[in-house]
Structure formats: structure tokens, C-alpha cells
């Protein structure tokens, strides 16, 4: 059986609603609190240094010149390019403060610039930021690392792409969302297919290793027909990876979303139709379903890692670098170092002012206990490999699986009867009909979801 086999079952999807955590971490960021601070971070960095663990760096650039109404990211909308300078000064301080607690022998296997719009920065600013990172951390200079950056095609031309390649980036992620002009107007992101194609042509010519495109379904004025056209156009661009996100309309939490007319949003039935059609189109075009909104061509390293059962998941999404300690730099950035999760202040002024006084801007986080570590491993296995061998967990954590999770058995048996999973005394296998619903299976093992929440998340009969 092909690993990417997934079966569409509308009845199951309606019963096991898709709402729930995306499990880029366990425990999820909802559990972070202010008890965790810089002292914990220094402690974790010391452990990382002693173990000489490899690193994955995430750098957050919060600025955007224009607002996209659907966006739920931490961002600052400004046309004033001068806003970047004071931020970069503080970011450089943070880089220095963190790096002095680590060993130069710790290789940076993965680097990702996200935002906001990283290409909001001028060429000189990008050069200087990368120079600071190279000075402070052990960046690989043989192009063997996974060094990626998020690109807004409206902000990037050939010279920008050339600069990024020269600075060591070898992966790009392109926000596209939808190509239909009516949808683009409704979300205030006007971006032509030509602009996107130009960036992709540049990336290919400059030998970037991997191109990812992001799409969103469920946006205002989208219909199954016009979204299918967007997907066809995107398939023609042949990205190595695709992310197809479900738009979550939460105007009470995200101010820009209040400018979206909720009457123009597609119905839940239309959204399901879009997702089903997208999966069919991408599968026919040779893409593998990796899980949780992600697709990749079979020769992409995510697909290969999944075949070899070494895929992992962290705040950067699916990754082949889950063994690295993740260091988040910049406003709102999250780090995962050993058993510590910690997040910088999400308020730009607070972030800048704290660093101005030579203090790190850690504002909240969480230290995993033994139960968290065990459940984290279970959820990782399910969400990355669609299977879980009890013996592996028993061996790693010195427990009896069925004894430890006995109270969950009735729920798991219910899922087995419904055809989401196969369950026996040795393993859980997520079946093709359950793969789109893998987060519902993970939620069974989430100790932080209240019982009533769990019901609300899973079954919407």
C-alpha cells in the first residue's frame, strides 16, 4: 500500500470534526504561562551546549507593507521601511545574548525566516542580519543545511532572489492563497500569477533546492469551481511542496478578519468539496499527502522521510530536523530546547524595550514533565507516520502502554469501529479514511483537552 493513500469519507469527516490543535507542539502553546522565564532558557541552553545538539533557527520579521485580511500572524503593518532598523538592532542583541550560551560546534542544520514579510527588509539589512547570524552561530557554508525564507512575490524580484541565494538560502515558501481576482480583492491581497511565476522561475534558475506554495481554502468569494482552477494553475507551477490551509474565521481574536464580510464565506459543505477536489487534483498530479494540510512530490525529502518513518513535527511544521534544538529569535518567536518551550513577548515595543536593557524578551513557556514527554512522543508518531508501535513507546518510557492509557481504550475502540484506525494489542494504524482526521486521533491522547472539549472537538453528530 502506498503511504500516501487517503480515502475520502464524508460521513466520518462530518462526525469527527476537523477542529482541534494542529500539534506543532505538545503540550500546545495554549498551555504556556508566565511562570517560565529567562532563567529556564539559560538552563536549557546550557544543556543544549553540553549535549552539543544541532540547531534549527527561526527568525521572525514582523513587518508587512500591506494587510491581508485573513492573516492571523504576529505582524506590524507599515509603509515606513525605517521601522525595521531599531527592530534589527534589538534582534542582533538577542542573537548575541543567546549565542554566547551555546557552543560554536553546534551546527545550524535548519534556518527559517518567517513573518510578516522577511523581504520587507532592504538588501543591506538582509546582508547585515545574515552576517550577524554567521558570526554568532555555526551556519553551514556548503549548502547542505535547510535554509528557507518566506517570500511575498509582490515584494521580491530577480535581484532579491539572487541576493537570498548568495546569502545561503536554498528553500523558498511562497504565499499565494488564491489566484481568483474577486477573492484577492475580498482579502486585500492582489497578486498576479505572473508575479508568482517570475519568483518561481528565478528560484529554479538560481538552483533553490525546494519551492513551497501556500494555499488557503474557505476564503470569502471562493467557490469549489474557482478554487479548483487555482489548484490547476498551481500544479502547473510544479512546486516541490504545497500547504493547503483551512481558513479559520475568528474576527473576535484577529482584528483584520473583521474586514471580511462573513456572508461571502463559503459554507462548510463547500469547504469540504474544495478540500476533496484539491486532494484528488494533487494526488492525480503525483503529489503525496504528508498529513495535516501538507503535500509533497515523492522525491521531496519530506515524502522520503515519511517513507522511512523519520519525519517529525515542530513549530516549523513537518520537518526532517526534529532532533535539533529550535531557537526562536525575534518578536513572538517560540523556542523548543530539550524539554523547554518558551516564547518571546508578542508586543513589538515590549520586545524592543526589554532587549534595550540587555535582557532577553522571554515572556511565557512551559517545561515538559514525564507525562508530557510520553504523550508528545505518541502524538508525534501518529501525526508523522500514521502509526504507533506500543513496544517502541514502552521501551523508550519504561511503561506498559495499555496499562498507562487504559482509560482511553473505549475511545480508541470507537474510532476503530468507525474505520478511522486499526487497533490491536501491539499498535495503532491510522487507516486511509482516518488520515485527514489524524488530529482527532491525537486529541484522544491530549491530557489538556477537557473531556467535554474532547467530545466537542471529535464528534459533531
State each model region's role.
Residues 53-88, 181:
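Canonical Radical SAM [4Fe-4S] cluster-binding loop centered on the CxxxCxxC motif
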Residues 435-461:
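Short, amphipathic alpha-helical interaction segments positioned at domain boundaries
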Residues 183, 307, 428-445:
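Short, cationic-aromatic polyanion-contact patches
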Residues 393, 410-418:
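Basic amphipathic alpha-helical segments that dock to polyanions
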Residues 416-426:
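A short, conserved structural fragment
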Residues 1-55, 104:
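Flexible, acidic/Gly-rich N-terminal and inter-domain linker regions that tether
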